[in-house]
Amino acid sequence: MTDKIILVVSFGTSYNNNRALTIGAIEKDIDEAFPDYEMRRAFTSQMVINILKKRDDLAIDNVEEALERALADGVKTVIIQPTHIMNGTEYHFKIKDTVDKYIDKFENIPIAEPLLISDEDFEDLIASITSKGDYDDDTAVVFMGHGSPAESNMVYTKLQGMLKDKGFDNYYIGTVEAKPDYDDVLAMVKEGDYKKIVLKPLMVVAG
């Protein structure tokens, strides 16, 4: 057993097929890219963890359980790699606050950032989402994220603004649980003369 691990931390999902195709695919890529490290999994949603345990007898650690397991296994280096899109409540309270309690218990325990932090991160995401599909001006392309009550939810507004600045006027960003919500996006789309709407997820996985 190696003394170096990468702990891939996701919100989690109770949909088994979906989990394998999304979180599982990310974990597989990380595992293949860093062969000197053992890849391990943790979820931040205790509700998802409980459902999987009760329904499927599938045990998945939360962050604290994963770190306790690493300590028991004699691990010295733990790289925390979140799959979260932004530094919202899950990232701060479920990951950073938990990891802070273990700073002195490992030789090295760095925390990677979520997807959207720097302007370059936004540029990369825009390049990715606008390169998928060939949509004309008659088509509104709507991306929906989960959303968050945290201040970091502003990433969606920033992303919308940068898309407009780059001339992607038919691209719209909304959220399921925050702002801009369904009604906000619908109002924006109605301002255009579109014949077709394409709805896409801006999230890693369904919950």
Segments and roles (model prediction):
Residues M1-G207:
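Active-site-proximal alpha-helix that buttresses catalytic centers in soluble enzyme cores
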